[in-house]
Design a protein with these regions (language model features):
Chain B
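Conserved short C-terminal alpha-helix that flanks the catalytic cleft of nucleotide-sugar-dependent
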Residues: 62, 162-163
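Non-catalytic, surface-exposed connector residues within folded enzymatic/regulatory domains
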Residues: 70, 122-125, 171, 232
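The canonical Cys-X-X-Cys-His
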Residues: 70-80, 131, 159, 170-181, ...
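An amphipathic alpha-helical core segment
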Residues: 175-209
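Short cysteine/histidine-rich zinc-coordinating motifs and their immediately flanking basic loops
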Residues: 84-91, 186-192
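N-terminal, post-signal-peptide region of Sec/Tat-exported proteins
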Residues: 46-79
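Post-cleavage N-terminal segment of exported redox proteins
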Residues: 2-54, 82, 92-157, 183, ...
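Short coil/turn and helix-start
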Residues: 67-68, 168, 229
């Protein structure tokens, strides 16, 4: 089950810069840690986080095993026009999660 | 039990051991105050506190039907914002018809088995922690208020005795660290006063949410004592004692701790 | 959690090196070279914010920000963060544009040990800028039994 917390303003002035913060539940297993039987636990990370504004990509981040469990990312965006910010996380084991928030620009 | 001196033998561990706690002004410190600014900010910002992911998960479980009774928590308890407000602040408590106290996760599991007719959720399982976090979150900002039930006294006293007894290969008591040496550094880490203000906590060391029991186990392992079995009554006794010791302090669940 | 042990008395905490999987200053230099090629890197314009004392290396808040007008003509195109001692030198690489308005990224990283962190920004004119920070990581006390 997708478990995501996104923080973005519901409204923004046209042309202003807004901060978008996103937190997602994920173990970010490094692939370097030994498990119970001394066997390495297979890597299971989010590899990529992208954001779009009304479909146009505005942010793209490639992650590594050095990103902490339950990854948190904050970034900025220019509130160009009212619309939908789409957030997408993809990773190992076919992990795909999408979340959308709507920002009204006035 | 505010002894002024502690045995000189302890000097192997702490150069000078001294009871700093004093009667009078409330000088108690939540573990939050021992953390750096960055971690305090992480705890205080709901969209940055990873524990809030579990609270969100818990709110989903709250509304999900389970067991042969096919009932959700919400079916009986309604809106948790009102029905669960203040509940975490007064646990452990003795359920109706029972004789021994249960802690909050014990109480939730009672509802699982008796009211939902579902299987118990395993200790430290994600679903149990999420429900516990969701329930505890409803008491955030409220003072810890243990119930005035005289039947609890005997259990609490046993908890106090455990707290003060030396144990483990290192022959230490909880009190030696958490009363007499709180605020000092141990291998670079500040020893907190051990107030259960934030539970369940998102502990960075665990990279996940965990219960007060798990935290206590860590301290027992730290002093090389055999931790009690995962659902042993000793944990509830210790929790009763710790909650009483922290009476009036504000609940912060879900806390963030290093 | 056998890796680290809580030893009162000697106040010692043993860290078993991660062995061959460990990144090194050389591996970091190599990873940086892959990004910047032969270009010069100027230590300016980039700010790397980390807590002065890291209480647990599992989750370390980090903010990288770059001075830039963030216009179409002059903006930050990419921000990369590297480390010396985690198993791999790359921490993250992000692509930005004028649409971001502000060149700042916050995240949380894992740091297995005290080490140097480097952030590199590439601006739209193809130049590279950097900042670095030396971080000290405290290892947690009172850990789990072996899991």
């Amino acid at each position: 089950m997708a478990n995501v917390l996104v923080n973005a303003p519901k409204t923004a002035k046209r042309g202003s810069v807004v901060e978008i913060k996103a937190l997602i539940m994920h173990p970010m297993e490094t692939g370097f840690r030994p498990g119970t039987m001394g066997k390495i636990i297979p890597r299971n990370i989010i590899e990529r986080f992208t954001a779009t504004w009304n479909g146009t990509e505005i942010f793209d981040m490639e992650m590594s095993p050095a990103i902490a469990a339950n990854p948190f990312v904050s970034f900025f965006a220019v509130a160009s026009e009212s619309g939908t910010v789409g957030l997408r996380w993809t990773g190992d084991e076919g992990f795909v999660v999408e979340e959308r928030v709507v920002i009204a620009v006035e | 039990m505010r002894a002024l001196h502690f045995g000189i033998g302890l000097a192997i561990i702490f150069a000078a051991s001294w009871a700093a706690a004093q009667v009078g002004a409330d000088k108690r410190r939540s573990g939050t105050q021992d953390m750096g600014e960055a971690l305090q900010k992480m705890q205080d910002d709901d969209t940055a506190n990873p524990g809030m992911l579990f609270v969100q998960l818990g709110s989903q479980s709250w509304a999900k039907k389970a067991g042969t009774a096919d009932k959700s928590c919400a079916d009986c308890h309604g809106n948790a914002g009102t029905s669960m407000k203040g509940v975490a602040a007064r646990y452990p408590a003795i359920p109706k018809g029972a004789e021994a106290p249960v802690d909050l996760d014990g109480r939730i599991n009672l509802c699982r088995t008796e009211n939902q007719k579902a299987e118990r959720l395993p200790p430290e399982s994600r679903e149990l922690l999420a429900l516990e976090a969701y329930v505890a979150h409803q008491s955030r900002g409220l003072p810890i208020a243990p119930p005035a039930d005289p039947r609890l006294d005997a259990f609490r006293d046993q908890g106090a005795a455990i707290y003060r007894a030396r144990q483990g290969q290192l022959n230490l008591s909880c009190a030696i660290c958490h009363d007499d040496n709180a605020g000092r550094k141990l291998a670079g880490v500040t020893i907190p006063e051990a107030h259960p203000t934030g539970y369940p906590i998102y502990r960075l060391e665990w990279q996940t949410l965990g219960s007060l029991k798990r935290r206590l186990r860590n301290c027992l392992v730290g002093i090389r004592a055999e931790p009690y079995a995962s659902e042993a009554p000793e944990y509830v006794m210790l929790e009763l004692f710790l909650m009483d010791r922290a009476k009036g302090m504000v609940l912060e669940a879900p806390g963030v701790r290093p | 959690m056998d890796r680290r042990r809580f030893l009162v008395g000697t106040a010692a905490i043993v860290v078993v090196p991660l062995g061959s999987a460990s990144a090194t200053p050389e591996a970091m230099a190599e990873a940086i070279r892959k990004v910047v090629g032969d270009s010069a890197v100027t230590e300016s314009r980039v700010t790397l914010d980390l807590p002065p004392l890291i209480e647990n290396g599992n989750t370390v808040p980090l903010v990288v920000s770059v001075e830039s007008p963030m216009t179409v003509a002059d903006h930050v195109k990419a921000i990369h963060v590297f480390n010396e001692k985690n198993p791999q030198p790359n921490v993250f690489s992000a692509r930005l544009s004028a649409r971001n308005g502000r060149a700042a990224i916050g995240t949380r990283i894992k740091l297995g040990d005290s080490q140097k962190i480097v952030a590199i920004a590439e601006t739209s004119d193809g130049r590279f800028w950097s900042a670095s920070a030396d971080v000290i990581v405290t290892l947690a006390a009172c850990l789990e039994e072996s899991t």
